[in-house]
Amino acid sequence: MLKNFIQKGKLINSISSSSSFQSSTFLNNNGFNSGAWVGSRFFSLEQLKKKTKNQKLINWVEEQAKLCKPDNIYICDGSEEEFKKFTDDMVKSGTLIKLNSKRPNSFLARSDPSDVARVESRTYICAKTKEDAGPTNNWMDPNQMKQTLKPLFNGSMKGRTMYVMPFSMGPLGSDISHIGVQVTDSPFVVCNMKIMTRMGDKVLNQIKENDDFVPCLHSVGAPLAKGQKDSHWPCNPNKYIVHYPEERSIQSFGSGYGGNALLGKKCFSLRIASSMAKEGGWLAEHMLILSLTNDKGEKKYIAAAFPSACGKTNLAMANSVLPGYKVQVCGDDIAWMTMRNGQLYAINPEFGFFGVAPGTSASSNPNALAAISKNTLFTNVALTPDNDVWWEGLSSPPPTAIDWLGNEWHPNGEGNNTFAAHPNSRFTAPLSQCPSIDPEWNNPTGVPISAVIFGGRRSSTVPLVYQALNWKHGVFMGASTASELTAAAEGTVGTLRHDPFAMLPFCGYNMGDYFAHWLSMEQKAGSNADKLPKIFYVNWFRKNKTSGKFLWPGFGENVRVLKWIFDRCNSTLDTTDGKATQTPIGFVPSNNSIDLNGLEINKSSLKELFSLNKSEWLHDLKSMRQFCQQFGDRLPNEIKNQMDQLENRLNKD
């Protein structure tokens, strides 16, 4: 049924459906048609022209409209009214399920079973040369890729609306922030982007006449014929997620899943931004940002890089078990860092949390539970009989539920899926709703970083925590990061893979050059190099070799390790403070330097947590050498030197 949707003085014809605003015309405030014909369809660009003088933006949107042939174009303003309109429409169409009033303004979506995670095998870095993309990225000649994608995008939005979303990665007005514009045919993507980025009119107003922006084209690749019923989760089995680093542009086809479709997230803020950062002398990293305040009121900011689903969100939102210590969060996934007088300052370019649901509970992450108590989009979790959400690890299982595939589910029942919620099921929630949000989280200047932590999921070999001997050694530690695979990426769960800096899926250029860029920060800092962050490595996941049980309780107890890191940031790179012992791999906590007051942990577990097995480390080093061979002459000599030095220290010990 056609109805008028009045929004901020604009009268737009619309139809309630999953694709929203399915009218073939737009009307201006006087009720007259305005716009230009494209083929047999009518598109209005007058609203965009009224809002911006940036001709590059206007031309780009018009080009995408001519290519994708949507039924209409809608310029998103980012308002709450707009969000409500889209979610109401998607509830009516079956794309969303509205949750009960105890979780206000929150919704559940179920994806197509084939569209549940990032698709690394279909993700491309189309640099001008294969060498610039590097051996860890999929590559195709950019012109060839565009020829491949053009027929796929041609008419891909028929029967749908093209939504135009101006968005800012980072606080508006920050010299660290950058602006993008995404067009999409998915209202679900629009609603997620409203939460995850600063999106809408306030951003469009920032794009001046000659400003650059990162253009992001997205289509689910499921055009609708006239009268055709839409899917609750339209997607296409032929998926491409493509980045052009020299052009600073993105194209994504076929997927509606977060990391593939929310192009401000991994695509822009890591793959494209890392390339921009290399050129601009800054860092775009797969890192959380947190602050730790000690019992004397002193605060330090820490950035930490872990692969997906290895505890970034839980650490960023940890509740301290130590009296007088407080953890606050600036971001749980991405950090953009720039140097000022040797000091790295970081912003979180995102505006929301896109967290893994399974395992999130009142005991593991109470702040996350509070953050997702309202205004949240859930994907692929289970639905309880009272219209709330559930996932493994949240609480005791409900007596019955509807699983992520839409089937009836009973705990331990016959014919069940293994999981009620998909292992990579997600929540999208505003950062501002987290009770432990740091007051500086939205500061356009950024926050000063005192420590950088690397870590991964290792069941053996790597101790609970150790510290780099110097900056070069710290870069090597980041480069040697390895982790057991998780459900957030394609592949066999549990398989160990090298994941340097937790950036393997996200580095937008040759990773050998990326290592060199990190090494260059020391020279860039010059005489202020002592202000560079101290570098550490942690492993919460080490297991007892006999029982297979975790040796460290993790979660809030990890603050004990953060306290040691905090104290080491106040010390020089030696052992004079009595809190560290030098070993072949770096500085490890000396006896009794980790605050264990109130923690029940036996001496044998503690000993195993910090044990160093020479043969295991030499095996890891051999694996690292093999991994680095692929970079050829793009591997910095300093990384080779660090491998040699580590081997010498291990053999001397």
Curated annotation (Swiss-Prot):
Highest taxon of the lineage: Eukaryota
Annotated TM spans: none
Residues where phosphoenolpyruvate binds: 118, 259, 424, 426
Record's keyword terms, sorted: Decarboxylase, Gluconeogenesis, GTP-binding, Lyase, Manganese, Metal-binding, Mitochondrion, Nucleotide-binding, Transit peptide
Keyword GTP-binding applies: yes
Gene3D superfamilies registered for this protein in UniProt: 3.90.228.20, Phosphoenolpyruvate Carboxykinase, domain 1, Phosphoenolpyruvate Carboxykinase, domain 2
UniProt subcellular location: Mitochondrion
Binding locations of GDP: 309-314, 358, 457, 540, 550, 555, 558
Reaction catalysis annotation: oxaloacetate + GTP = phosphoenolpyruvate + GDP + CO2
GO CC terms: cytosol; mitochondrion
Annotated binding of Mn(2+), by residue: 266, 286, 310, 333
InterPro entries in the record: PEP_carboxykin_GTP_CS, PEP_carboxykinase_C, PEP_carboxykinase_GTP, PEP_carboxykinase_GTP_C, PEP_carboxykinase_GTP_N, PEP_carboxykinase_N
Pfam families recorded: PEPCK_GTP, PEPCK_N
EC number: 4.1.1.32
Annotated organelle transit peptide span: 1-51
Main localisation: mitochondrion
Molecular function terms, GO-annotated: GTP binding; manganese ion binding; phosphoenolpyruvate carboxykinase (GTP) activity
Pathway membership, UniProt: Carbohydrate biosynthesis; gluconeogenesis
Enzyme class: lyase
The protein's required cofactors: Mn(2+)
Cofactor binding mode and count: Binds 1 Mn(2+) ion per subunit.
Note: In eukaryotes there are two isozymes: a cytoplasmic one and a mitochondrial one.
Subunit: Monomer.
Alphabetized HAMAP family for the sequence: PEPCK_GTP
Described purpose of this protein according to its UniProt entry: Mitochondrial phosphoenolpyruvate carboxykinase that catalyzes the conversion of oxaloacetate (OAA) to phosphoenolpyruvate (PEP), the rate-limiting step in the metabolic pathway that produces glucose from lactate and other precursors derived from the citric acid cycle.
Protein name in UniProt: Phosphoenolpyruvate carboxykinase [GTP], mitochondrial
Species this protein is from: Dictyostelium discoideum (Social amoeba)
